[in-house]
Regions:
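Conserved beta-strand hairpin/beta-sheet module of binuclear metal-dependent hydrolase folds
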Residues: 2-55, 152-168, 185
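Metallo-beta-lactamase
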Residues: 2-4, 93-152, 159-161
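Short glycine-/small-residue-rich Rossmann-like dinucleotide-binding loops
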Residues: 13, 45-46, 144, 190-192
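Short histidine/acidic/glycine/proline-rich micro-motifs that form metal-
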Residues: 18, 72, 100-104, 192-194, ...
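Active-site neighborhood of phospho(di)ester-bond hydrolases with catalytic His/Asp-centered motifs
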Residues: 41-45, 63-73, 99, 165-170, ...
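Active-site metal-binding motif and surrounding structural segment of the metallo-beta-lactamase
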Residues: 46-97, 184-185
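Short helix-capping segments at alpha-helix termini
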Residues: 87-91, 113-119, 241-246
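Cap/insert and terminal regions of metallo-dependent hydrolase folds
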Residues: 172-256
Length: 260
């Protein structure tokens, strides 16, 4: 009988937006995915290098780096991660998957990763809705997002232990749930609490609609702005659990989730 490796998510940082980023009330570090020997980092914002090493998750072990859009709370440590992933630029290895805004710049946004750094990785993939790509043992599909960077994407992640969804930054819109059906876990970037409408980010009201429509096995809220932190992410998560009957947790910095 074959034993499948665990899928591990290290949610190293749970902060989002410029005010939380600049105050570091919560870290803006992103998520490390590990399965067997494969490691991929998603959205390495400010502090990603420091706190990855602090958590003993060396960026030198990365097989892939994903940047879902061109805002600094998602991209600032990407270049130093590339230098680590390429063994100090000595080995042309690893996958860099990022949006047009990150790689080339568009509509006054970006680029945020230099051509030099793009040139030293093993493979560069420009991602937009529908693009499917691999990094080690993971298969990713870029999903639709509606955000102030018009090239933003979310992710659907195929693992040895089922599918994971990561919305990245997006407002709720009709049809969003179509990308996030049949999930073991949905990770929702939820910037604002109930009663605080915002079109370009998710709030708790939008999260409720998405969870009810997508029906994942479980959800984790992350990427909190100041208003969410002041309201209490744990209270918002409990409200969503009560309303949907689906387990919903509010992430904390350094949280580890294992799926088997």
């Amino acid at each position: 009988m074959t034993t499948l490796p665990e899928t591990i998510l290290d949610i190293l940082g749970t902060g989002g937006g410029r005010f939380v980023m600049t105050s570091q009330r919560r870290r803006t570090v992103g998520i490390r995915l590990t399965q067997g020997e494969t490691q991929v980092h998603i959205d390495p914002g400010p502090g990603a290098l420091v706190f990855s090493n602090w958590a003993k998750l060396s960026p030198e072990k990365l097989d892939g780096l994903i940047v879902t859009h061109c805002h600094p709370d998602h991209y600032t440590d990407a270049e130093v991660f590339i230098e680590a992933m390429t063994r100090g630029t000595m080995a042309k290895r690893g996958v860099l998957a990022a949006t047009k805004s990150v790689l080339r710049g568009a509509e006054g946004i970006g680029p945020s990763i230099s051509m030099y750094h793009q040139g030293i990785v093993g493979d560069v993939i420009e991602i937009y809705e529908g693009v499917v790509f691999e990094a080690g043992d993971f298969t990713f599909t870029a999903t639709e997002a509606k955000h102030s960077d018009p090239f933003s994407v979310g992710l659907r992640i195929q693992t040895a232990n089922g599918n994971i969804g990561y919305t990245s930054d997006t407002g709720y819109f009709p049809g969003l749930s179509e990308s996030y059906t049949d999930l073991r876990l949905l990770i929702l970037c939820t910037m604002w609490p109930r009663g605080e409408p915002i079109n370009i980010h998710m709030n708790t009201d939008g999260a409720l609609k998405l969870i009810e429509e997508a029906q994942p096995e479980a959800c984790i809220l992350t990427h909190f702005g100041m208003r969410m932190l002041n309201a209490g992410p744990e209270k918002e998560a409990a409200y969503l659990s009560d309303q949907t009957g689906i387990p919903v947790a509010a992430a904390v910095d350094g949280m580890r989730v294992s799926i088997s």
